[in-house]
Each structure stands twice: as structure tokens, then as C-alpha cells.
Design a protein with these regions (language model features):
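Aromatic- and glycine-rich peptidoglycan recognition patches
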Residues: 1-4, 8, 50, 57-58, ...
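Short, positionally conserved secondary-structure boundary motifs
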Residues: 8-13, 41
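Catalytic cysteine-centered active-site loop
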Residues: 19-71, 79
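Conserved acidic residues
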Residues: 70-73, 123
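Short, surface-exposed beta-edge/turn micro-motifs
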Residues: 71-72, 86-88
């Protein structure tokens, strides 16, 4: 039963992320109505009762490194090719994530597996819910 409860936390994080699709994005916003990329991951984890760091750097350094991401895991990317993590999305399973692109856009769902943009930029996944 305990394992099921932990898995439910990952599912809850993913469901919360999906519920925020089409919410506006704004640099520095951590919800509940506007988000930046690390604000979205922070908010979704907090609604599942999980405390994670607020900053992207700290989020990428914490948690447990996961080889195969599941719903609720955080996905980290180097989108500018400088060898540094500069972006995070929330895995919702099946090779998909929810993320908050730059200010003035909307939170959206995207494939990060077999995707010409996201796949080469993907670096690792972290789990905070287990």
C-alpha cells in the first residue's frame, strides 16, 4: 500500500501540471494562476504535499536521479547548448511533459521523446516523490 501511495503522488503532480495547461506564463511566477518553468514544477509538487526548492538550479541538484522518467518526475534540459541546465518540465508519462515556455505564452504539453527540439536538449530526470 505504501508504494501505491508514493506512485499516487507522482500521478497527482502530473495531473496538477495537466490542469495548468493554457495558464499564462510569466518570469518568476510560481502559481497558482501564472508560472515560469521552475515555478510550475514547484507549484505542482507543493499541491501533492512535496516540498522542493524554488530555484531551477536547486531543483536540478536535489531529488533522486531517475533513469526512466514516470509521471510526476521533473525533466531537466539545456535548451541553449552551454552545458548548463536552464529549463525544467513535469513528466506526465508516455514521453510527454507539461512545461511553461517564456513569458507571455501559455503552459503547454509537449513530447520530449523522439522530438527534434526537446530530445537533444534533454539531460536527466529527477524524482522528488519517492
Amino acid at each position: 500500500m505504501k508504494g501505491k501511495t508514493k506512485k499516487n503522488k507522482g500521478k497527482k503532480i502530473a495531473e496538477e501540471a495537466q490542469s495548468k495547461i493554457d495558464s499564462p506564463t510569466k518570469m518568476g511566477a510560481k502559481g497558482p494562476f501564472e508560472f515560469d518553468n521552475c515555478g510550475l514544477s514547484y507549484y505542482c509538487c507543493s499541491t501533492a504535499g512535496i516540498t522542493i526548492p524554488e530555484s531551477l538550479k536547486a531543483q536540478s541538484e536535489g531529488g533522486k536521479l531517475i533513469e526512466k522518467a514516470e509521471a510526476g518526475d521533473l525533466l531537466f534540459f539545456d535548451t541553449i547548448g552551454k552545458g548548463e541546465i536552464n529549463y525544467v518540465g513535469v513528466c506526465i508519462g508516455n514521453g510527454k511533459m507539461v512545461h511553461a515556455p517564456g513569458s507571455g505564452k501559455m503552459v503547454k504539453e509537449a513530447e520530449y521523446v523522439n522530438n527534434t527540439y526537446w530530445t537533444p536538449k534533454y539531460k536527466f530526470a529527477k524524482r522528488y516523490w519517492n
